[in-house]
Amino acid sequence: GLLVPENGVYRTVKLYAAKKADKFMGEVQVGQWSDWVYDNMLDDKGVKRPVAYKLRLFELAEDGSKLELYVSSACRLEADPNYTNPREIGQELLDHCGPIVNASNAGRPYAEIGQETWALNLDWCADAINYLLDNKPWDLFYCHLHAIDVANHNMLSDVVPESPRYERFYPLLVKYYENIDQVLGKLM
């Protein structure tokens, strides 16, 4: 990566494949998510596979002395045929809906990243559901999204007003419910 100063202040990180690469693969500014970064990674057998991931820049000191960067899990761009039924639908969903961000399980210190990755994940799920409902025959639609369940397990003890962490966690829990409302709105 490379820190890019603007008028002597660092606000942007650019990601390059190599130190002397001419073009950057992705960039991100403080407080933002990057667009998809397309890359290649070795799988467990040593085979190079195309993947996509996103960056989230939490902090970048104005003088460049401190950096806190989150890299999402990588989404393989070749669908695993064992993940979907029918098998061929996985690649079709990737082709029509793009890569998916898996929800982070980074824990309480990074609860905000958990909520943000769930929001990205749920947005993809809504797009995938709409694609399937519009383009495939179906008799029954059923969907189980775990975001609120996970959020309640992680935060429920801290969303009572007596909790010293209430001010941090209550707004996050509300965002999870808003994310599910947005999914429902996209499906209507």
Model regions and ranges:
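Metal-dependent active-site segment of extracytoplasmic phospho-/sulfohydrolases and closely related
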Residues: K175-M188
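His/Asp/Glu-rich, glycine-adjacent segments
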Residues: G1-S163
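Extracellular loop and loop/strand-boundary signature of outer-membrane beta-barrel proteins
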Residues: F169-L173
